[in-house]
Amino acid sequence: MFCHLRPMRRLCLEKIFPHWFPFSRALSGAEAVNALRPFYFAVHPDFFGQHPVEREINENSLKRLSVYLENLQKPGFKSLKPTQLTFYVRETDQSSSDGQEPFSTSGFRAVKFTLHTRDLLSTVLYILNSCSLSVEHIQSLNTNMHTQPLKEAKRMPDRPIKWDKSYYSFTGFKDPDEDLEQVSRVETTLTSWLDNNGKSAVKKLKNSLPLRKELDRLKDELSHQLQLSDIRWQRSWGIAHRCSQLHSLSRLAQQNLETLKKAKGCTIIFTDRSGMSAVGHVMLGTMDVHHHWTKLFERLPSYFDLQRRLMILEDQISYLLGGIQVVYIEELQPVLTLEEYYSLLDVFYNRLLKSRILFHPRSLRGLQMILNSDRYAPSLHELGHFNIPTLCDPANLQWFILTKAQQARENMKRKEELKVIENELIQASTKKFSLEKLYKEPSISSIQMVDCCKRLLEQSLPYLHGMHLCISHFYSVMQDGDLCIPWNWKNGEAIK
């Protein structure tokens, strides 16, 4: 007698997008990706090269979103746990800050939302709406089955229907708000999350072990063959992806061994573009073909010459600024090529020469500074180094450095002390839990890592035995079995 109630279940989602349901249909995976193009364009990590922290957060959130979308398409799935995501959204032509955080001076804003949808269409609409992006283009995806224009659909009365809890109890239907309400009532704790995800992580880690051994073998062979200092990756690609990149480099070495040996003593980094980095690492763009890589290795002697000139330029700037050391901190600065960084230094050096500001020789020895192209006022970082804008006023710069020099020395001393404590706690945590590996994402500070490890050591966590544990900003089981936990994980009372 209640058969007529089943179609009414879908009306619960009208609370979010009531005008779409008269003409909606199930989206395919390809259609969903196409519909999300404006979103991907607004959050793609490649557009955040000048902002490494925001870039990393977007990368991680995109991975979790991808898993969510994949699970939605699996046959027979019942329900998904609410997934909380954070994205930094670039200002685009169709972006609007209505109801959202305002854009920063860098041209992006942080958007946080929780996915608790049950199908691809409502998920796509929810994401676009959360980021204040247009949904007009999605109408074309429904024209094969429905020809009613969007503007007519919008004329329908927007009356959200909220069913009483007794309706779901009586019919046995799933309350779409139940999981979300539960999340708001009960925060995820470390022990509960490990209980729910530990076995899955162990299985993934076990499956990845052969590839991990292959990765280590390839890395050791290439490092020895080319006499490299190290081989690294800019992004957190999976083990299979990394092995594929090393196999590609190995094949190139077989064809052009003498050319590749020009990288002797260097660190090779697989990244988004080919060239030499600001600190002298050889960057191999993963989308480039062997021909581009070969040309890069052939040009290495000229890069080494530019690197020597860059070091001289850094020394000249240091001399003009009382002996302060010019450094480039990879974890905190945008990814720059050697040419880009040299140009930045050259502009700054010429401005200093023209201003003729005076510092007592060697009065600032032991201090450090980094150059930024997207700042307009100097600042002092908590780690003790100065953030100096390339185009800042030299007179203001002189006053700022002199007044903050003592505080900078104190910050640097605390940084060194904190680093020692951090390393000791990492070793202690690794030993106590018999971890195979304990590491952190670049955006996690030493203060956050110390706080995290101190609290971990107070726990009994048998699921961590033999695991790879990454301290991050969120909970996740990576594709190769690495466990990611937020640095401010909670067990009982919230950590503020």
Curated annotation (Swiss-Prot):
One of its GO terms (cellular component) is mitochondrion. Pfam families: DUF4460, DUF4461. Keywords: Coiled coil, Mitochondrion. Residues 404-437 form a coiled coil. It is found in: Mitochondrion. Signal peptide: none annotated. InterPro entries: DUF4460, DUF4461, TCAIM. May regulate T-cell apoptosis. This is T-cell activation inhibitor, mitochondrial. It comes from Homo sapiens (Human).
